[in-house]
Swiss-Prot record:
The gene is rnhB. The lineage of its organism: Archaea, Methanobacteriati, Methanobacteriota, Methanomada group, Methanococci. GO terms for cellular component: cytoplasm; ribonuclease H2 complex. Its cofactor is Mn(2+); Mg(2+). CDD domains: RNase_HII_archaea_like. Disulfide bonds: none annotated. This is Ribonuclease HII.
Amino acid sequence: MNEDIKNNLNNLDEFSGKIIVGLDEAGRGPVIGPMVIASVKINEKDLYKLQDLGLKDSKQLSKKKREELYVKISEICNVKKIVIAPEKIDEQMEITNLNKIELSAFSKLANHFIKENENISIYIDACSSNEQSFSNQFKAKLINKNVEIIAEHKADENYKIVSAASIIAKVTRDNVIEEYKKTFGEIGSGYPSDPKTKKFLKKYVHENKGLPKIARKSWATSKNLLKEIEESKIFQWVK
C-alpha cells in the first residue's frame, strides 16, 4: 500500500475543497441475487465524520451493525448505487466477463461525481489481481483522466471511504435477498457454497424443471443443476 497516500487521506489538519469518493461492490460471486455497486462521496474536510463511526469492511460487521452504519453513512455522505439484476448479469456475461461488468458500473458512478467536481480523489477496491491494470482500465472509462485514482486490493479494509461503500453495497444486497425470501422461502445467502442455497436451488430445479428468476443462469452451479435435469430426462427415456 502507498503509505503516503493513506496518510494524506487521513490527515484532517489541512482542509480543502477536495471531494473523496469510495467505490465497492457486494454480491460478485453469488449464484442468487444481484451484484450491487455502491459509491459514497464526501468533502475531504468532513472525513472525520466517517472515521468517528469506526467503520470496517462490511464482512467484519454484524448484520445489525451494518444496518445502523448504513443509516449514518447515508446521512453523512452522498450515496449512489447500481443494482445489477441476475438476468442482466447473465445477459452481459454472454459478451464480456464479471470484471468488465463491475468496471463499467464503477466508472458510471465515478463519472457522475466527476461531472460535479473535478477536484476529486477516487478510492476503489480493485476487482482484478493486477491493481495497476485495473486502475488503467478504470481511468480509461472516466470523462476526466486527470483525477486521482487509488485502486487496491482490500481497500475496504484500508480506507474508511471504501469501507463505507462496502457497507452500503452489502446492506442493499441483503435487503434484496430478504425480499426474495418473502416469495421463495429460505434461500440462504445466495452463495454457491451455502448449503441452504444449494438445497433451495436443487429442490426448485427438480420441482419446476428450471431455475428461478432470481438465479444467475450463467453460473456453474446453475448449469450443473440444469445438466442434472437433462441427464435425468435421458435416463428416464432410456429406461
